[in-house]
From Swiss-Prot:
<keyword id="KW-0997">Cell inner membrane</keyword>
<dbReference type="InterPro" id="IPR012692">
    <property type="entry name" value="ABC_MetN_proteobac"/>
</dbReference>
<keyword id="KW-0547">Nucleotide-binding</keyword>
<dbReference type="InterPro" id="IPR050086">
    <property type="entry name" value="MetN_ABC_transporter-like"/>
</dbReference>
<dbReference type="GO" id="GO:0016887">
    <property type="term" value="F:ATP hydrolysis activity"/>
</dbReference>
<comment type="function">
    <text>Part of the ABC transporter complex MetNIQ involved in methionine import. Responsible for energy coupling to the transport system.</text>
</comment>
<dbReference type="GO" id="GO:0005524">
    <property type="term" value="F:ATP binding"/>
</dbReference>
<dbReference type="InterPro" id="IPR003439">
    <property type="entry name" value="ABC_transporter-like_ATP-bd"/>
</dbReference>
<dbReference type="GO" id="GO:0009276">
    <property type="term" value="C:Gram-negative-bacterium-type cell wall"/>
</dbReference>
<comment type="similarity">
    <text>Belongs to the ABC transporter superfamily. Methionine importer (TC 3.A.1.24) family.</text>
</comment>
<keyword id="KW-0472">Membrane</keyword>
<keyword id="KW-0067">ATP-binding</keyword>
<dbReference type="InterPro" id="IPR045865">
    <property type="entry name" value="ACT-like_dom_sf"/>
</dbReference>
<dbReference type="Pfam" id="PF09383">
    <property type="entry name" value="NIL"/>
</dbReference>
<keyword id="KW-0813">Transport</keyword>
<keyword id="KW-1003">Cell membrane</keyword>
<dbReference type="InterPro" id="IPR018449">
    <property type="entry name" value="NIL_domain"/>
</dbReference>
Length: 343
Protein backbone atom coordinates (compact mmCIF):
# COMPACT_ATOMS: atom_id res chain seq x y z
CA UNK A 1 0.00 0.00 0.00
CA UNK A 2 2.85 2.40 0.89
CA UNK A 3 6.27 1.92 -0.67
CA UNK A 4 9.03 4.44 -0.07
CA UNK A 5 12.21 3.79 -2.04
CA UNK A 6 15.56 5.50 -1.44
CA UNK A 7 14.00 8.63 0.06
CA UNK A 8 16.44 11.47 0.75
CA UNK A 9 15.34 14.86 2.03
CA UNK A 10 17.68 17.84 2.26
CA UNK A 11 16.76 21.21 3.77
CA UNK A 12 18.67 24.41 3.04
CA UNK A 13 18.83 27.09 5.74
CA UNK A 14 20.91 29.96 4.43
CA UNK A 15 24.37 28.51 3.89
CA UNK A 16 23.58 25.41 5.97
CA UNK A 17 22.52 22.09 4.47
CA UNK A 18 20.57 19.67 6.68
CA UNK A 19 20.00 16.10 5.55
CA UNK A 20 16.82 15.05 7.35
CA UNK A 21 16.46 11.68 5.59
CA UNK A 22 19.16 9.56 4.01
CA UNK A 23 18.25 6.83 1.52
CA UNK A 24 15.21 5.57 3.45
CA UNK A 25 13.19 2.65 2.09
CA UNK A 26 10.01 1.40 3.76
CA UNK A 27 7.19 -0.93 2.71
CA UNK A 28 3.83 -0.94 4.49
CA UNK A 29 1.52 -3.74 3.28
CA UNK A 30 -2.19 -3.05 2.89
CA UNK A 31 -4.19 -3.39 6.10
CA UNK A 32 -1.21 -3.22 8.46
CA UNK A 33 -0.53 -0.87 11.35
CA UNK A 34 3.11 0.12 10.93
CA UNK A 35 5.02 2.17 13.49
CA UNK A 36 8.14 4.28 13.04
CA UNK A 37 9.85 5.08 16.34
CA UNK A 38 12.68 7.49 17.00
CA UNK A 39 13.88 10.25 19.27
CA UNK A 40 13.16 13.94 18.66
CA UNK A 41 15.01 15.17 15.57
CA UNK A 42 15.52 11.66 14.16
CA UNK A 43 13.56 12.47 10.99
CA UNK A 44 10.31 10.65 11.63
CA UNK A 45 7.99 13.65 11.06
CA UNK A 46 9.80 14.46 7.82
CA UNK A 47 9.41 10.82 6.77
CA UNK A 48 5.66 10.65 7.33
CA UNK A 49 5.13 14.01 5.61
CA UNK A 50 6.93 12.64 2.55
CA UNK A 51 4.20 10.00 2.17
CA UNK A 52 1.58 12.57 1.12
CA UNK A 53 4.20 15.01 -0.21
CA UNK A 54 3.61 17.67 2.42
CA UNK A 55 7.39 17.45 2.23
CA UNK A 56 8.58 16.65 -1.27
CA UNK A 57 11.60 14.29 -1.21
CA UNK A 58 14.85 15.57 -2.67
CA UNK A 59 15.36 12.10 -4.12
CA UNK A 60 13.42 8.85 -4.17
CA UNK A 61 10.09 7.27 -5.03
CA UNK A 62 6.75 7.46 -3.16
CA UNK A 63 4.20 4.83 -4.17
CA UNK A 64 0.78 4.84 -2.49
CA UNK A 65 -1.73 2.23 -3.66
CA UNK A 66 0.42 1.66 -6.74
CA UNK A 67 0.52 5.34 -7.75
CA UNK A 68 3.80 7.26 -7.98
CA UNK A 69 3.05 10.56 -6.25
CA UNK A 70 6.25 12.44 -7.09
CA UNK A 71 5.40 12.62 -10.80
CA UNK A 72 1.82 13.90 -10.40
CA UNK A 73 0.65 17.38 -11.32
CA UNK A 74 -0.79 19.57 -8.54
CA UNK A 75 -4.37 18.71 -9.49
CA UNK A 76 -3.56 15.00 -9.70
CA UNK A 77 -1.78 15.16 -6.34
CA UNK A 78 -4.77 16.88 -4.72
CA UNK A 79 -6.98 14.02 -5.94
CA UNK A 80 -4.49 11.38 -4.73
CA UNK A 81 -4.31 12.98 -1.28
CA UNK A 82 -8.01 12.26 -0.77
CA UNK A 83 -6.97 8.65 -0.32
CA UNK A 84 -4.50 9.61 2.44
CA UNK A 85 -5.97 10.85 5.72
CA UNK A 86 -3.72 12.41 8.36
CA UNK A 87 -3.95 13.31 12.05
CA UNK A 88 -1.47 15.27 14.13
CA UNK A 89 -0.35 15.83 17.70
CA UNK A 90 -2.36 19.07 17.71
CA UNK A 91 -5.93 18.57 16.60
CA UNK A 92 -6.26 21.63 14.30
CA UNK A 93 -10.02 21.88 14.72
CA UNK A 94 -11.88 25.04 13.71
CA UNK A 95 -13.18 26.61 16.91
CA UNK A 96 -16.01 28.37 15.06
CA UNK A 97 -17.44 25.11 13.74
CA UNK A 98 -19.32 22.40 15.60
CA UNK A 99 -18.08 18.82 15.71
CA UNK A 100 -20.38 18.07 12.76
CA UNK A 101 -19.04 21.08 10.87
CA UNK A 102 -15.41 20.13 11.41
CA UNK A 103 -15.93 16.59 10.11
CA UNK A 104 -18.06 17.86 7.22
CA UNK A 105 -15.47 20.39 6.03
CA UNK A 106 -13.44 18.16 3.64
CA UNK A 107 -16.69 16.86 2.14
CA UNK A 108 -17.97 20.40 1.62
CA UNK A 109 -14.71 21.36 -0.08
CA UNK A 110 -15.18 18.37 -2.38
CA UNK A 111 -18.72 19.56 -3.28
CA UNK A 112 -20.36 16.48 -1.78
CA UNK A 113 -24.21 16.65 -1.75
CA UNK A 114 -25.68 17.75 1.59
CA UNK A 115 -27.63 14.53 2.14
CA UNK A 116 -24.46 12.50 1.60
CA UNK A 117 -22.52 14.78 3.98
CA UNK A 118 -25.11 14.29 6.71
CA UNK A 119 -25.11 10.52 6.25
CA UNK A 120 -21.32 10.24 6.14
CA UNK A 121 -20.63 12.54 9.11
CA UNK A 122 -23.26 10.82 11.26
CA UNK A 123 -21.71 7.46 10.39
CA UNK A 124 -18.19 8.66 11.24
CA UNK A 125 -19.14 10.26 14.55
CA UNK A 126 -20.80 7.01 15.57
CA UNK A 127 -17.64 5.12 14.54
CA UNK A 128 -15.40 7.26 16.76
CA UNK A 129 -17.78 7.22 19.72
CA UNK A 130 -19.08 10.80 19.43
CA UNK A 131 -22.59 10.15 18.18
CA UNK A 132 -24.02 12.51 20.81
CA UNK A 133 -21.61 15.41 20.10
CA UNK A 134 -22.85 16.65 16.71
CA UNK A 135 -23.62 20.15 17.93
CA UNK A 136 -20.79 20.57 20.45
CA UNK A 137 -17.93 22.99 19.85
CA UNK A 138 -14.24 22.07 20.26
CA UNK A 139 -13.94 24.26 23.36
CA UNK A 140 -16.39 21.96 25.14
CA UNK A 141 -14.47 18.77 24.34
CA UNK A 142 -11.68 16.94 26.15
CA UNK A 143 -8.35 16.30 24.44
CA UNK A 144 -9.32 12.74 23.63
CA UNK A 145 -12.65 13.83 22.16
CA UNK A 146 -10.90 16.45 20.01
CA UNK A 147 -8.58 13.78 18.62
CA UNK A 148 -11.60 11.58 17.87
CA UNK A 149 -13.09 14.46 15.87
CA UNK A 150 -9.77 14.81 14.01
CA UNK A 151 -9.80 11.08 13.24
CA UNK A 152 -13.38 11.28 11.93
CA UNK A 153 -12.44 14.27 9.76
CA UNK A 154 -9.40 12.39 8.39
CA UNK A 155 -11.69 9.50 7.42
CA UNK A 156 -14.33 11.69 5.77
CA UNK A 157 -13.11 11.11 2.21
CA UNK A 158 -12.95 7.34 2.82
CA UNK A 159 -9.15 7.09 2.50
CA UNK A 160 -7.18 3.88 2.13
CA UNK A 161 -4.31 5.16 4.29
CA UNK A 162 -4.22 7.02 7.61
CA UNK A 163 -1.02 8.80 8.68
CA UNK A 164 -0.62 9.51 12.41
CA UNK A 165 2.00 12.11 13.34
CA UNK A 166 2.57 11.73 17.12
CA UNK A 167 -1.22 11.57 17.46
CA UNK A 168 -1.24 10.62 21.15
CA UNK A 169 1.79 12.46 22.54
CA UNK A 170 -0.33 15.37 23.88
CA UNK A 171 -2.75 13.04 25.69
CA UNK A 172 -2.73 11.51 29.16
CA UNK A 173 -2.04 7.74 29.45
CA UNK A 174 -5.68 6.65 29.82
CA UNK A 175 -6.81 8.77 26.87
CA UNK A 176 -3.84 7.55 24.83
CA UNK A 177 -4.95 3.95 25.39
CA UNK A 178 -8.51 4.75 24.29
CA UNK A 179 -7.32 6.48 21.10
CA UNK A 180 -5.00 3.59 20.27
CA UNK A 181 -7.85 1.12 20.78
CA UNK A 182 -9.98 3.25 18.46
CA UNK A 183 -7.28 3.20 15.76
CA UNK A 184 -6.96 -0.56 16.15
CA UNK A 185 -10.73 -0.96 15.84
CA UNK A 186 -10.85 1.26 12.73
CA UNK A 187 -8.02 -0.75 11.18
CA UNK A 188 -9.90 -3.97 11.84
CA UNK A 189 -13.31 -2.74 10.68
CA UNK A 190 -12.29 -0.78 7.60
CA UNK A 191 -9.10 -2.60 6.58
CA UNK A 192 -7.39 0.78 6.78
CA UNK A 193 -3.60 0.90 6.38
CA UNK A 194 -2.11 2.96 9.23
CA UNK A 195 1.39 4.44 9.36
CA UNK A 196 2.20 6.11 12.66
CA UNK A 197 5.25 7.79 14.09
CA UNK A 198 6.02 8.03 17.79
CA UNK A 199 8.79 8.32 20.35
CA UNK A 200 7.00 5.92 22.72
CA UNK A 201 7.51 2.16 22.50
CA UNK A 202 4.28 1.66 24.48
CA UNK A 203 2.36 2.92 21.42
CA UNK A 204 4.15 0.47 19.13
CA UNK A 205 3.71 -2.38 21.60
CA UNK A 206 -0.01 -1.79 21.96
CA UNK A 207 -1.23 -1.71 18.34
CA UNK A 208 1.50 -2.10 15.68
CA UNK A 209 2.14 -5.15 13.51
CA UNK A 210 5.59 -3.98 12.38
CA UNK A 211 8.03 -1.31 13.51
CA UNK A 212 10.98 0.57 12.07
CA UNK A 213 13.56 2.38 14.20
CA UNK A 214 14.84 5.68 12.81
CA UNK A 215 18.00 7.49 13.91
CA UNK A 216 19.73 10.48 12.30
CA UNK A 217 17.55 10.23 9.21
CA UNK A 218 18.19 6.52 8.59
CA UNK A 219 16.13 3.41 9.28
CA UNK A 220 18.49 1.28 11.34
CA UNK A 221 16.14 -1.61 12.09
CA UNK A 222 12.74 -2.82 10.87
CA UNK A 223 10.78 -6.02 11.42
CA UNK A 224 7.65 -7.36 13.06
CA UNK A 225 7.03 -6.01 16.56
CA UNK A 226 7.41 -9.47 18.08
CA UNK A 227 10.76 -10.01 16.34
CA UNK A 228 12.17 -6.62 17.35
CA UNK A 229 11.10 -7.17 20.96
CA UNK A 230 12.47 -10.73 20.97
CA UNK A 231 15.73 -10.06 19.13
CA UNK A 232 16.58 -6.35 18.93
CA UNK A 233 19.59 -5.83 16.67
CA UNK A 234 20.60 -2.28 17.61
CA UNK A 235 21.34 -0.54 20.93
CA UNK A 236 18.65 2.06 20.17
CA UNK A 237 15.97 -0.61 19.74
CA UNK A 238 17.11 -2.19 23.01
CA UNK A 239 16.84 1.20 24.72
CA UNK A 240 13.28 1.74 23.50
CA UNK A 241 12.29 -1.76 24.60
CA UNK A 242 13.77 -1.25 28.05
CA UNK A 243 11.78 1.98 28.36
CA UNK A 244 8.54 0.02 28.10
CA UNK A 245 9.67 -3.12 29.96
CA UNK A 246 11.05 -1.31 32.97
CA UNK A 247 11.32 -2.11 36.66
CA UNK A 248 12.72 0.35 39.18
CA UNK A 249 15.18 -0.92 41.76
CA UNK A 250 13.57 -0.45 45.21
CA UNK A 251 15.06 2.40 47.22
CA UNK A 252 16.44 0.19 50.01
CA UNK A 253 18.31 -1.87 47.41
CA UNK A 254 19.64 1.25 45.67
CA UNK A 255 21.21 2.36 48.95
CA UNK A 256 23.03 -0.98 49.34
CA UNK A 257 23.85 -1.74 45.71
CA UNK A 258 27.57 -1.72 44.85
CA UNK A 259 29.23 -2.02 41.46
CA UNK A 260 31.94 -4.49 42.56
CA UNK A 261 31.65 -7.76 44.51
CA UNK A 262 32.43 -7.74 48.23
CA UNK A 263 32.53 -10.32 51.04
CA UNK A 264 29.30 -12.34 51.44
CA UNK A 265 27.55 -10.39 48.67
CA UNK A 266 25.01 -11.68 46.16
CA UNK A 267 24.46 -10.42 42.59
CA UNK A 268 21.31 -8.52 41.71
CA UNK A 269 20.12 -9.56 38.25
CA UNK A 270 17.77 -8.10 35.69
CA UNK A 271 16.24 -10.94 33.67
CA UNK A 272 14.33 -10.51 30.41
CA UNK A 273 12.19 -13.40 29.17
CA UNK A 274 10.69 -13.68 25.68
CA UNK A 275 8.74 -16.30 23.79
CA UNK A 276 8.90 -19.80 25.29
CA UNK A 277 11.24 -18.74 28.10
CA UNK A 278 8.41 -16.70 29.70
CA UNK A 279 6.37 -19.74 30.72
CA UNK A 280 9.22 -22.18 31.34
CA UNK A 281 10.14 -22.82 35.02
CA UNK A 282 13.73 -21.73 34.42
CA UNK A 283 14.46 -20.28 37.87
CA UNK A 284 13.27 -23.46 39.55
CA UNK A 285 15.50 -25.42 37.21
CA UNK A 286 18.56 -23.31 38.10
CA UNK A 287 17.89 -24.00 41.78
CA UNK A 288 17.89 -27.76 41.12
CA UNK A 289 20.83 -27.81 38.72
CA UNK A 290 23.22 -25.32 40.31
CA UNK A 291 22.33 -25.15 44.00
CA UNK A 292 21.32 -21.48 43.85
CA UNK A 293 18.33 -19.73 45.40
CA UNK A 294 16.55 -16.83 43.72
CA UNK A 295 14.93 -14.10 45.76
CA UNK A 296 12.51 -12.35 43.38
CA UNK A 297 12.37 -8.62 44.14
CA UNK A 298 9.84 -7.59 41.48
CA UNK A 299 8.48 -8.83 38.15
CA UNK A 300 6.29 -7.71 35.26
CA UNK A 301 4.73 -9.42 32.24
CA UNK A 302 3.35 -7.83 29.06
CA UNK A 303 2.51 -8.55 25.42
CA UNK A 304 3.84 -7.06 22.17
CA UNK A 305 2.93 -8.20 18.68
CA UNK A 306 1.04 -11.15 20.18
CA UNK A 307 4.14 -12.40 22.00
CA UNK A 308 4.50 -12.54 25.78
CA UNK A 309 7.42 -10.77 27.46
CA UNK A 310 8.60 -10.78 31.05
CA UNK A 311 11.09 -8.84 33.14
CA UNK A 312 12.33 -9.62 36.63
CA UNK A 313 14.68 -8.28 39.31
CA UNK A 314 16.15 -10.99 41.50
CA UNK A 315 18.95 -11.76 43.93
CA UNK A 316 20.77 -15.00 43.15
CA UNK A 317 22.20 -16.67 46.26
CA UNK A 318 24.97 -19.24 45.91
CA UNK A 319 28.71 -19.61 45.47
CA UNK A 320 30.38 -17.51 42.78
CA UNK A 321 30.99 -20.62 40.69
CA UNK A 322 27.37 -21.78 40.98
CA UNK A 323 25.86 -18.36 40.21
CA UNK A 324 28.09 -17.92 37.16
CA UNK A 325 27.08 -21.36 35.89
CA UNK A 326 23.39 -20.61 36.51
CA UNK A 327 23.62 -17.28 34.66
CA UNK A 328 25.33 -18.95 31.69
CA UNK A 329 22.61 -21.62 31.63
CA UNK A 330 19.84 -18.99 31.64
CA UNK A 331 21.52 -17.20 28.74
CA UNK A 332 21.69 -20.47 26.81
CA UNK A 333 17.91 -20.71 27.28
CA UNK A 334 17.29 -17.28 25.70
CA UNK A 335 17.05 -15.26 28.90
CA UNK A 336 18.81 -11.90 28.74
CA UNK A 337 20.75 -11.46 31.98
CA UNK A 338 22.19 -8.17 33.24
CA UNK A 339 24.16 -8.00 36.49
CA UNK A 340 23.04 -4.70 38.03
CA UNK A 341 25.47 -4.88 40.95
CA UNK A 342 25.95 -6.60 44.29
CA UNK A 343 24.12 -6.40 47.62
Amino acid sequence: MIKLSNITKVFHQGTRTIQALNNVSLHVPAGQIYGVIGASGAGKSTLIRCVNLLERPTEGSVLVDGQELTTLSESELTKARRQIGMIFQHFNLLSSRTVFGNVALPLELDNTPKDEIKRRVTELLSLVGLGDKHDSYPSNLSGGQKQRVAIARALASNPKVLLCDEATSALDPATTRSILELLKDINRRLGLTILLITHEMDVVKRICDCVAVISNGELIEQDTVSEVFSHPKTPLAQKFIQSTLHLDIPEDYQERLQAEPFTDCVPMLRLEFTGQSVDAPLLSETARRFNVNNNIISAQMDYAGGVKFGIMLTEMHGTQQDTQAAIAWLQEHHVKVEVLGYV
